[in-house]
Every structure is written in structure tokens, then in C-alpha cells.
Curated annotation (Swiss-Prot):
Membership in a protein family: Belongs to the ATP-dependent AMP-binding enzyme family.
Residues involved in ATP binding: Y246, T247, S248, G249, S250, T251, G252, L253, P254, K255, G256, V257
Organism: Schizosaccharomyces pombe (strain 972 / ATCC 24843)
Protein name: Long-chain-fatty-acid--CoA ligase 1
Coiled coil: none
């Protein structure tokens, strides 16, 4: 493999050389066309170039089917049969809008915003789940030089109030079911004058808001769409603020990251130039939160490619949650999917579950084909397509629509085993590394140089990087290989956090470098391997450091684990794991190997000592297979009978662990596990 990063300076004391993409050593890219300098220019340029081609597709809900069954639950220490309801969704086929259609809609929405009194320079918050209408409303704002403010629809009252108060928004787009979350914030926020809500809302929520704020304009989206004909754009300059993107807030109140139009055009340009293999013939499945920089950036990148975006919902991604129709993946049949590690682990475990239920002959055929293809890919030899046709295409057709060409994983660490497995069975999985502060990505694997290693890829041509010595863990930027804290600089880098002087001084240097807080290792090929975050490097009782995210990414590959939080007490020698078990697999194990009744409650299964031992044994097996040091092997496990969700506050909307909240919630169980 050719070297993919090039040093453009000499190393200094305590820091490495500065590195850039080997194909762009002399400059950092800022735009891909002379007429593209803002994110609205990206939109307008694509409309001119692709016209009547399909740009976006979405589905309508036809009917919600509710099924109720009796389940066993422990209530006040006694087992009781209680009713539990499941919802299944019947959806239409995809409805498509052309590039010309979406441009017309965006400028109609822009005219409506103007009629409602919103003007150039105003801030407009998008507080809603991902949809075509979210992005088109954003484009409407950008066409009139308004700044968009993003907030996760799972943010909750405190975080929402913080984003509204700090940014001073005048308008908002939301969903009817979220109006109730706005009731208390509206008592304090006087700047918010217009709320546009899509889909049905409860009359009591509407009435309450009108009583609190009688002069506030509360508009149904259906009415909003009809308010105005298209208006002329009043576009911004490159240095103007495109968006204030609130992070998901895993360590306190979310920070508002200020991203200019120049920042966003730089990241779009970098991906377009770095991944020329993706074209206007590709189809991107959109289901991650648009309030997350990864999704926001890649939907705009897809528009620049001239690809088609198909909007999906996490609840209807797969066929199992649908009735009288296929799920979003099998209906849209994407060629490109972007996801976070939690999604890819779920996909891998789904494939493994079906494989383990197959006959011995089919399993043998699968694994023979798997290891053969792995060898061919490792040595860049021909023949993989024969194995795809004979074995793997059937799996792709069943789960992903059969057209996937590339997947991308970002957001946090993914197990190398999962990347390797899905790259062989489905399609090449490109690993990326980035942050909101760098407008989504600093590194992405280059498809032309794809391999099965565990690096986060090569530098994008809009970013330069250096490694700086890190005392935590004794990482040396002059070592072999070089290791240290990752510092980034370039045109995609934010100017800073909104109203956060202290954090800005801590995170950004006077000469333009951003201290990421992440620790990386540079390979001889010029690829970056992420080791961990500085704050997740924990010194144990014997003085040695362990990397929590590294352990979690490996242990999460267990078929018994749905989610995991590794905790290391500095007064102890080893860490322990707080685990959300994979219920179907663990229930089967509890019945067959722990002697529990099939009717045992889920709480009983999770608290059973034999079940815990079986889960512990599997984690130790995985740790040893990865040659973990003794201090990296789990001391004990805590099995919890609830999921980690944004709704209960145990993960952020971006699926990042809320470590402190998890530790506080399960403190009693953690103390007991350490005491055993």
C-alpha cells in the first residue's frame, strides 16, 4: 500500500511533524467549483447540474398496527401476567422529489419564513427527527442568510432550554408530538416568535402554548407549505455562520459548535475529492439524527454527488417492525449507508443469529467462503466476486436490499472484528474519524486503498494533523510508531464554541490548532489508528492505564451483549462491565445452561448468578482472543434489565455513553460486583 499521509514539516520537541493527505501536500482544499462557496451554493449547484434527477425519497405512514400480548413481569416482588403492546407500521412506497422539486420547495419555504417575519441574520432552530422536510427547511433558511441551530429531538427540557436561551432563536421547526417539551421553555424564552410543527399535535399542548404565549405564531406545516410562492435567494457570504450545532452533551450541557459556510463547503469538497468512486448513481439511506454532524454533512455531500437520499426511520429500518410492506432498507435498497458502531454491531449480530440457526452444512459453507475471501482481500487477489455470487449476495439481499457498495462507520470506536466481518459479508466498510468541531470528519478510509485493518483511514485533503505527547498513558509522538494527542487544523475547523470562552481557550491554540482530546497512532502507511480519548484513559490501582473505549468496542462483539459500559475504579486492579444483555440470546442461554424457566422475568434472568457467570466467561474469552493484558480483563459483570436510551438519559442521541449517569444509576450493583 502506498503511503497516504505526507509530512510537510519537521518534528518539534514533544510533537510530531505536521501531516497532510499525500495527494494534496501543497494546499488544503476549500471548494470543488468556482461557484460554490456556501452550503446554499452546494445545493444550488447540484440543482443546476442534476435538474430532474431524483434527489430525495420519503415514505408516508399508511397505518399503525398495535398488537397486545400478556407477558410475565415482577411487580412488588411477585410474578404477574401483564399486558404489553407492540406497534407495527404499514408504510407507502417511496415518494421521490427531483432536484428541481426540492429547490422549488426550499424557496417556497423561504418565502413563508419571510412572511412570518424572519429575516437575514436571524437564528432558526430545527428540533425534529430526520426527514426530507427537516433538510429542506434548513436549505430555506440558508437561502435567506439565516443561521440554523440544531437540537436533537431527544434532547429533553433542560438541554432544549439551554440551546434556545444561548442561541437566541426567533423561529423553530418541530414535530407535533414534541410540542409538550416546549411548554416550560416557552415560559422563559421570549425571543422565540414562530413555531412550525409537522404532523398531528395534541389539542391540549397547542392550547397550553397559546395560553403561555398568546402572541406566538404556531403554524401547521401543511399551512406553512402553502403560504408563499418561491422567492429569490438572499445568500450568505462564506464567513457567515451556517449553523450552530449542539453536541449531544455526554459531559454536561451541550456545547454550541459554530460552523461557517466555509467550514461546511470544505468538508463537502474534501469528501467529494477523497471518494470519487461515489457518483450520482448512488443511493444514500438517511436515518441518523440530522442534528448530528455526521448525518448533516453526508446528506449535503450526497446532494453534491448528485445521489438520491432515501429517508428512513430507525423503527422501520428492517422488515420485522413493518406490516404489509418491507422495511426501509429493503424498499429503498441503498448503495451507501452511514452508521454508528451500535448500528453495525446490531447488523453483525443479526447475521450471526441467522447463521447460528442454519444447518451445519450451511455454516461450514459460509465460514469456508468467509476465510477464503478474507485471504483474497488481504493479498489483493481476484476471485472474491465468485464467493459473493455463491454465498454472500443472498445475505445482502435479505438484509440490505442487495445493492450496498460502501458503508461508513463513525461517531466512536468500532471493533476491528465487526469491520472485518461486515466488509467481507456485505461490502467494504470505510472507517472515519471526526468531531463536530471539524465539520464531521478529519480522516476517512480511501476506497481505492481499502484494506481490512483497524485504522480510521487517511487524512482528508481539507485537514492537517500532528500528534502531541500525552502524559496520560505515556504516549510519545517521536516513538515507533508515533503516538499522541491528535491536533487538527484546516478550513473545516470551527471558529469555536458559542459563548464558551473557557472551553475555547482550552481547546484551541492561538495558531489555529484544535486539541481533540483523542489519542492516535500513525501507521507506517500514513493511516491513523484511534487508541482512545484522554478522559477515558483510567489509571488503575497498580499505576497502569487502560483505555475504556477500546475495551468496550471489543467486548461489545459478544453475541450476549447488546450494549456495554466498562468502568474502572482507580482503587481497584481491574475494570468491570455494566451490560445490557442481548435478550433473545441470553434468555435461551438462561433456559438451556442456567436452569431457569422460559417464563422467568427479565429481571430474574439478569440477576441470576449462573447467567452472570456465563456472560462473564464469554467476555473473558473475547479478551483473551484479543490478547488483552491481565488488567484489561473484566473482574466482574453487572447485567441490567433496561436498555441504555436517550429517553432514560443513559446514552446521548448520538448513542454515546453517559458514563456518570450510568454509574450513578447502578452504583449499588457496581459496589456489590466489586465486593464479590
Amino acid at each position: 500500500m502506498k503511503v497516504q499521509s505526507k509530512a510537510i514539516s519537521k518534528p518539534k520537541e514533544h510533537e510530531s511533524a505536521i501531516y497532510r493527505n499525500a495527494n494534496f501536500p501543497d494546499h488544503l482544499v476549500e471548494t470543488y467549483s468556482d461557484d460554490v462557496h456556501t452550503l446554499f451554493d452546494v445545493f444550488r449547484h447540484s440543482v443546476k447540474q442534476f435538474g430532474n434527477k431524483k434527489a430525495m425519497g420519503y415514505r408516508n405512514l399508511v397505518k399503525e398496527h398495535v398488537e397486545t400480548k400478556m407477558v410475565t413481569k415482577v411487580v412488588d416482588g411477585e410474578k404477574k401476567e401483564v399486558p404489553k403492546s407492540w406497534s407495527y407500521f404499514e408504510l407507502s412506497d417511496y415518494n421521490y422529489l427531483s432536484f428541481n422539486d426540492i429547490y422549488d420547495k426550499a424557496l417556497r419555504y423561504a418565502g413563508a419564513l419571510r412572511k412570518l417575519g424572519l429575516n437575514k441574520g436571524d437564528k432558526f432552530e430545527l428540533y425534529a427527527p430526520t426527514s426530507a422536510f427537516w433538510l429542506l427547511t434548513a436549505e430555506a433558511c440558508l437561502s435567506q442568510s439565516m443561521t440554523i441551530v440544531t437540537a436533537y429531538d431527544t434532547l429533553g427540557e433542560e438541554g432544549l432550554l439551554h440551546s434556545l436561551r444561548e442561541s437566541g432563536v426567533r423561529g423553530m421547526y418541530t414535530e407535533g408530538h414534541l410540542l409538550k417539551t416546549l411548554v416550560n421553555p416557552l415560559k422563559e424564552i421570549e425571543s422565540l416568535e414562530v413555531i412550525i410543527y409537522r404532523n398531528d399535535a395534541k389539542e391540549e399542548d397547542i392550547k397550553t402554548i397559546q395560553e403561555i404565549r398568546p402572541n406566538l405564531k404556531l403554524i401547521k406545516f401543511a399551512d406553512f407549505e402553502k403560504m408563499s410562492p418561491p422567492v429569490e435567494p438572499d445568500p450568505p457570504s462564506p464567513e457567515e455562520i451556517c449553523c450552530i450545532m449542539y453536541t449531544s452533551g455526554s459531559t454536561g450541557l451541550p456545547k454550541g459548535v459554530i460552523l461557517s459556510h466555509k467550514n461546511m463547503v470544505a468538508i463537502v469538497t474534501a469528501i467529494v475529492k477523497h471518494v470519487p468512486e461515489v457518483t450520482s448513481k448512488d443511493y444514500l439511506l438517511a436515518y441518523l439524527p440530522l442534528a448530528h454532524i455526521l448525518e448533516f454533512a453526508f446528506e449535503n455531500i450526497c446532494l453534491a454527488w448528485g445521489g438520491t437520499i432515501g429517508y428512513a426511520n430507525v423503527r422501520t429500518l428492517v422488515d420485522t417492525n413493518c406490516r404489509n410492506c418491507k422495511g426501509d432498507i429493503n424498499t429503498f435498497r441503498p448503495t451507501i449507508m452511514v452508521g454508528v458502531p451500535a448500528v453495525w454491531e446490531m447488523v453483525r449480530k443479526g447475521i450471526m443469529s441467522k447463521l447460528n440457526a442454519a444447518s451445519a452444512v450451511k455454516r461450514s459453507v459460509f465460514w469456508t467462503a468467509y476465510y477464503t475471501k478474507a485471504k483474497l482481500m488481504r493479498h489483493n487477489l481476484p476471485g472474491s466476486c465468485v464467493l459473493d455470487t455463491a454465498v454472500f449476495n443472498k445475505i445482502r439481499s435479505m438484509g440490505t436490499g442487495g445493492r450496498l457498495r460502501y458503508t461508513l462507520s463513525g461517531g466512536s470506536a468500532l471493533s476491528p472484528d465487526t469491520k472485518r466481518f461486515l466488509s467481507i459479508v456485505l461490502c467494504p466498510m470505510l472507517i472515519g474519524y471526526g468531531l463536530t468541531e471539524i465539520s464531521a470528519a478529519a480522516m476517512v478510509q480511501n476506497p481505492a486503498c481499502f484494506n481490512l485493518d483497524d485504522s480510521a483511514g487517511s487524512l482528508l485533503p481539507c485537514t492537517e494533523m500532528k500528534l502531541v505527547d500525552c502524559e496520560e498513558g505515556n504516549y510519545n509522538s517521536h516513538g515507533h510508531p508515533p503516538r499522541g494527542e491528535i491536533w487538527l487544523r484546516g478550513p473545516s475547523l470551527t471558529r469555536g464554541y458559542l459563548n464558551r470562552d473557557k472551553e475555547n481557550k482550552e481547546s484551541f491554540t492561538p495558531d489555529g490548532w484544535f486539541r481533540t482530546g483523542d489519542v492516535g497512532e500513525l501507521t507506517p502507511e500514513g493511516l491513523l489508528r484511534i487508541i482512545d480519548r484522554k478522559k477515558n484513559l483510567v489509571k488503575t490501582q497498580n499505576g497502569e492505564y487502560i483505555a475504556l473505549e477500546k475495551l468496550e468496542s471489543r467486548y461489545r462483539t459478544s453475541s450476549l451483549v447488546s450494549n456495554i459500559c466498562v468502568y474502572a475504579d482507580q482503587t481497584k486492579v481491574k475494570p468491570l462491565a455494566i451490560i445490557v444483555p442481548n435478550e433473545p440470546v441470553v434468555r435461551k442461554l438462561a433456559t438451556e445452561q442456567a436452569g431457569l424457566s422460559p417464563d422467568a422475568s427479565w429481571e430474574e434472568v439478569c440477576h441470576n448468578k449462573k447467567v452472570r457467570q456465563l456472560v462473564y466467561d464469554d467476555l473473558i474469552r473475547i479478551g483473551r482472543s484479543h490478547h488483552f493484558a491481565n488488567i484489561e480483563l473484566i473482574q466482574n459483570v453487572v447485567l441490567v434489565p433496561i436498555e441504555f436510551t436517550p429517553e432514560n438519559g443513559l446514552v446521548t442521541a448520538a448513542q454515546k455513553l453517559q458514563r456518570r449517569k450510568i454509574l450513578d444509576r447502578f452504583k449499588k450493583e457496581i459496589d456489590a460486583a466489586y465486593a464479590e
